[in-house]
Amino acid sequence: MKSFEVNFDGLVGPTHNYGGLSYGNVASQSNSQQGSNPREAARQGLAKMKALMEMGFKQGVLAPQERPDIAALRRLGFTGSDAEVIQRAAKDAMPLLVASCSASSMWVANAATVSPSADTADGRVHFTAANLNCKYHRSIEHPTTSRVLGAMFSDEKVFAHHEALPAVAQFGDEGAANHTRFCRAYGEAGVEFFVYGRSAFDSRYPAPQKYPARQTLEASQAVARLHGLSDDGVVYAQQNPAVIDQGVFHNDVISVGNGEVLFYHEDAFLETDAVLGQLQAKLASKGGNFKGICVPRAAVTVEDAVRSYLFNSQLLSREDGSMLLVVPEECRNNERVWTYLGQLTSQGGPVKEVKVFDLKQSMQNGGGPACLRLRVALKENELAAVNPGVIMTASLYDTLVQWVDKHYRDRLGEADLADPQLLVECRTALDELTQILKLGSVYPFQRQP
């Protein structure tokens, strides 16, 4: 039976803004308070989806969340009508209103961790929504994320969904941004690679000193247990704390893997040789041939990697066995990175082509091509069980562009977040979107009695 990797990209929400909410994310911090263009952001994301679909890759779409999150503000003590809640929050606690308006759910690499059926004990595709406990504005996402994923992957014979891990720092879980999978073919058993920043309960593990380590070893282990993964198909690795302190807040900012290939920076991990040895041995036991592509710090510094998002790229397998690397425009604008990429594609390795996309609206908030997509490896029968409304087609692309142009503003600043009309616009747009994508009532405003 055929098998595929399907990339489900996050659709940028109507409240996309530069709130500077993500401490440890250099781009998010440095672009704080700039004016944003939600319409352009959504169009840039859709253009990438369309281009990859037209190149023959399986492509889906993941809906954004309801923002501002009025229920979250009510939990923090703001009362009155929805409009009054917004106005009171704007007057008394603007940072809380900004957080409740964040469109950060567009970075669906953080939506969940996904294990394909070939790896799991019960032979189903498993999803665990990420609690994103490290940042308040993201910690409020997982209930809606779970409902949206449940509406997309609803057949319980094929798909299994788990609640987010306990919402405490010891089980901080950032989803697929700290997880990748190696395999000979997508439908065959593989090796799942979990990368963590610290241990919650074992002080012998080093930890970063400046920025928080968002993923714990204990969270990664819990997800592996929930998904029914066997020890011979799992490798845990600690990310280098020094690079976290340089702005590498998720592992997908310093490495990316696909198939039998790991593309990584020399400074990405602690005990790199041991990690690579485990990956090689465990993948070999599954019939695979692991290949590591190390980018030396002499060619590309960690600072270059963070500025360009070289590793926050998509590594995609072509029909002929070669690979395509999808990178943001910022890579072309960095001389050292662009020189390295030219060498990479000409040296006879698996990466044969680099494709550049303009994702500036997302990049200025610290999210590149890899942040915008959730990978789901599916066999042919499993793909047939996915809600067809979320699979990208030329027709769906056209419909979504028209939907964006109809509902999204082309300018959004902090003061605009206090406008109750923005909430009305967002709810109107999302109500229409659930009909376009055939999701049913997944948003809180649709579920109120």
Curated annotation (Swiss-Prot):
Pfam families: AstB
GO BP, sorted A to Z: arginine catabolic process to glutamate; arginine catabolic process to succinate
UniProt key word Nuclease: no
Region of interest (Disordered), residue spans: 23-43
Gene Ontology molecular function: N-succinylarginine dihydrolase activity
Composition skew (Polar residues), residue ranges: 25-37
Highest taxon listed in the record's lineage: Bacteria
Active site: residue positions: 174, 250, 371
Enzyme class: hydrolase
Catalysed reactions listed for this entry: N(2)-succinyl-L-arginine + 2 H2O + 2 H(+) = N(2)-succinyl-L-ornithine + 2 NH4(+) + CO2
EC number: 3.5.3.23
Amino-acid positions noted as binding substrate in the UniProt annotation, renumbered to this chain: 19-28, 110, 137-138, 214, 252, 365
InterPro entries the UniProt entry points to: AstB_sf (IPR037031), SuccinylArg_d-Hdrlase_AstB (IPR007079)
Function (record text): Catalyzes the hydrolysis of N(2)-succinylarginine into N(2)-succinylornithine, ammonia and CO(2).
Subunit structure and binding partners: Homodimer.
PANTHER family reported for this sequence: N-SUCCINYLARGININE DIHYDROLASE
Family in the record: Belongs to the succinylarginine dihydrolase family.
HAMAP family: AstB (MF_01172)
Protein name: N-succinylarginine dihydrolase
Biological source species: Pseudomonas entomophila (strain L48)
Gene name in the database record: astB
